[in-house]
Amino acid sequence: MRSVLLFVFALLAGATAHASPRLAPEDIFRLNWAGDPRVSPDGSFIVYTHNFMDVMEDRRRSNLWRIDSDGRNARPITTGAVNDGNARIGPKGRRVAYTSATEAGAQLFVRWLDGGETLQLTRLPRPVSNLAWSPDGNWLAFNMLVSAEAPTMGALPKAPEGAKWADPPSVVDRAVFRFDGRGELPVGYSQVFVVPAGGGAPRQVTGGNYHHDGAIAWTGDSRGLFVTGIRRENAELDPRNTDIYRVDLDGGELTAVTDRRGPDDGVRVSPDGRRLLWYGYDDRRLSYQRTRLYVADLDGANRRELLPGLDRSVENPRWASDGRGIYFQYDDRGRTRLAHVSLRGKLTDIADTLGGLGLSRPYSGAAFSVGGGNTFAFTSGDSLKPADIAAGRGTGKPVVLTDLSRNLLDNRALAPVEEMLVKSGHDGREIQFWVARPADFDPAGRYPLILEIHGGPHTAYGPHFSAEVQLYAAAGYVVVYANPRGSTSYGEEFAQTIHHNYPSEDYDDLISVVDAVVAQGSIDPDRLYVTGGSGGGVLTAWIVGRTDRFRAAVVAKPVINWISFVLSADWAPYFAQYWFPAMPWEDPMGHWRRSPLSLVGNVSTPTMLLTGQEDWRTPMWESEQFYQALKLRGVDTALVRIPGASHSIASRPSQLMAKVAAILEWFDRHGGDGENDDAA
């Protein structure tokens, strides 16, 4: 790790001394981006999170900003080195509720937008989520974990006064007892609360040994709630079987609105208070199914699916302010689109420039909302800059309102990103991919190439900003990233080709992508490199077990042994039941055949492992198995462990820099050098 940090500092010093026009590692601290836009009830203004980096504390921070829907009068609502978010504008547009997180914890606040007065509503022991204003403006609802009594095993005698005994044993009787990014989970259940918006004690309105941690929506008369939870026997072993319930706040009665096998969530009440929308599907125990959009009466009767022919997952559906249709987003061929559907099922696409939520890798995804006059706002981005705020009205053309990173990115030469297609060598299936070439790319040169593979595996890359891709290109590499079979945004059949079959022919897809780029020229075929994280780490380890074509590889936060993974990952009940047709003790060879460790005897490629020390999604012992196997075989290898990092290995700015620095150093050690070997 020390050599990685020294390399980071060397990069920083070199970038400063030479004033490079390319993106430099320290520029990560200068990036700003937008998130979570919220449109006011009259459509006149938008509240959003303005995200930035804190170089002294090495943290991502966020404040709330306000901007008029025409782009004027941008100004901060909150300031400081804190994390303000989850903004919800009150029904009259005069107040905004939000959470503010500091080192002391996260609490709920209400701020008056005209005068700036701020009321701290809560002093709670746990963070809150899913804020929702009542239509009359008198209440706020939210989710929060309520502690339960921890199990014990045996009793100890009382320690003498002043004695310093060891901590008592920790007893686990839950299937999910720790989670990535959170560590060991406290004993308890997520419940729904309501609190007076003017101040007062929160009141718990759900109960039982069940989690109620999904969306919350108020009834039109502000006397009831629609909540989401898993209220079934053995709920923790059936993690996708959520339902929607109605809670009467006067009497406390709870009534099921949905009752089927599948993940119903995202409930919202129509502006006239007469109908519901939500998304979900009938669960068939597949590793991927597209989410579908439903509308129904308030009691769940007369349910119908609005877009049965849309072979894409519906995300974040919201009622239009006139109640005549629904806005939603969906991923399509790597891009994230905003669309409107009428209650008769007519689909209208509005924009395909949504994105920019991430900084590290070019994943699809976005955030949007709708307010009065059907004014919508969304996070807008592309491959050359992270998220800004765009807005429009109805189904009209949106306009980008902010340019948060202009001061930095207008003064950096970034790598342009080109979209391409290739036929897979396995079956001729069309595979979409993108190529980022250095800003000073010379077609007559011969460049090293990095194949960067996304995780998931059911996710998608697209033409979105990626600091990692830009830093690799700034170091002189051509970077290629693709959506092999199994990726989302191409329909259910494309994603389901790897169901109980991962990794498999996705290998052929990726090799075909590399072949296509090499065939175009300007690539040195003797300097090919491969890396990927999570599911991309699985495929990277699989690739070096199938071919010695790549000069070096970096396997980040992988699964190496499916038998150990499905029984020790944080969400074991899901992985064990949805990713394999049988349990590992019932079909050990089925798990082993798909494990990269089964191919380690073939590996000759110098391969580095890189994982966060607090990763509970693909735990460190997965990387350690591959590392030790390579060591025993005499293959050049190294194990980079990121202290304090979870599966989101680059969540802190310096961790992102350290990850990129380690990968570049490993490739440079093995002939990459990031240099263009001129053909002349």
What are these regions (language model features)?
Residues E468, Y481-A680:
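Active-site-proximal cap/loop segments of hydrolase catalytic domains
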Residues R38-F45, N86-R95, L131-W139, I216-G224, ...:
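Blade-terminus and WD-like Trp-Asp/Gly-His loop motifs, strongest in beta-propeller folds
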Residues V47-M56, V96-E103, A141-S147, D180-P186, ...:
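Beta-strand C-termini and the immediately following turn/loop, strongest in propeller blades
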Residues A19-A34, R59-R60, I67-N83, S100, ...:
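Multi-bladed beta-propeller domains
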Residues R232-E233, R284, L404-D526, G533, ...:
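Cap/lid segment of the alpha/beta-hydrolase catalytic domain
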Residues R95-G154:
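Hydrophobic or amphipathic alpha-helical targeting/insertion segments
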Residues E26-S62:
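Beta-strand-rich domains and repeat architectures in extracellular enzymes and scaffolds
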Residues R61-S62, L145-V195, T228, D238-D243, ...:
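Predominantly five- to eight-bladed beta-propeller fold
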